Amino acid sequence: MTLLALVWLLLDATFLITLLWHLLQGCKSGHSLLCSVFQDLIRYGKTKTGLQRPAWLQWFDIPKRCFWHFYCVSLIWNGCLLWILLRLLLQSVPVPEWLQLVLHFLHAGSEPQILDRELSVILALALLWLHSLRRLLECLFVSVFSNGVIHLVQYCFGLGYYFLIGITVLTYCPLDRRTVSTDNLLTQCHWYHILGLALYIWASLHQYRCHCILAGLRKSASGNVINLNHSVPCGDWFERVSCPHYFAELLIYVSIAVVFGLLNTIWWLVVLYVLLNQALAALLCHEFYHEKFDTYPIHRKAFIPFIF
């Protein structure tokens, strides 16, 4: 097993244990220092509302509006990786030595990569880059952030996450192949590339709509911000789940798994991480809505329609 796969497995295990611990009411009502730190680390934004926190924990608070930093870093980093890959494949420009060292360190001991995966890797990196661009623009020009906060650990983790994602994609094809022609890339095109792109577009469209609905709760008809309160969102996938934008995020990562032809094992570990991470965040939001609004629709699930 490579170090990269081990990292994703550890992240999966950590969030699975955290989710199960929360579902079993662990530390939910406890007032010990350990419970306070646990709750502070798993919550952010509105789900921290009403949380009894020691004053010193507030030293680690960072405004939630800094979410745009994650997408800015991802845009630059994954854009650079895509540029390096395209120059290698189309112009025979070698991969920088520092990147080769990073890839070797994280992916040493893996099975030899199979040729003719270049198109899948190019598409995956391009989709990640486009996703980061859209989310950055949404954070800057659509979303209306309250005074909610995130923990410094969550902030640092988020920055590292997008670094790791791009590296994970690159490990799927050999980077010692000097050139690949446009005709060769076209011959690599399969049905799963088209299906993955369709799912990506569909999920991205719904995520954008959901973010617009959330922003609209704090804006007037003319688009001016009129409040920073929390309200019950309605419309689109909100009719089925409390956090459809999290569900759409999961579908976006599944769509990239489809682009890989469902064969990239490490990427499925990434998908599992997104599933567990977003499920925990959705569950906390779902509980917040039910505690704050007595008339909150009881038929809505937290994360996945009809299931969870």
Swiss-Prot record:
* Record topology, Cytoplasmic segments: 1-2, 87-120, 170-184, 277-308
Is this entry keyworded Transmembrane? Answer: yes
EC id: 1.3.1.94, 1.3.1.22
| Molecular-function GO terms, alphabetical | 3-oxo-5-alpha-steroid 4-dehydrogenase (NADP+) activity; oxidoreductase activity, acting on the CH-CH group of donors, NAD or NADP as acceptor; polyprenal reductase activity
Q: Write down the InterPro entries for this protein, in alphabetical order.
A: 3-oxo-5_a-steroid_4-DH_C (IPR001104), Dfg10/SRD5A3 (IPR039698)
Tagged with keyword Transmembrane helix: yes
**Highest taxon, organism lineage:** Eukaryota
The cross-references to Pfam families, in alphabetical order and at most eight, read:
Steroid_dh
Official protein name in the record = Polyprenal reductase
Whichever gene encodes this chain, its name is srd5a3
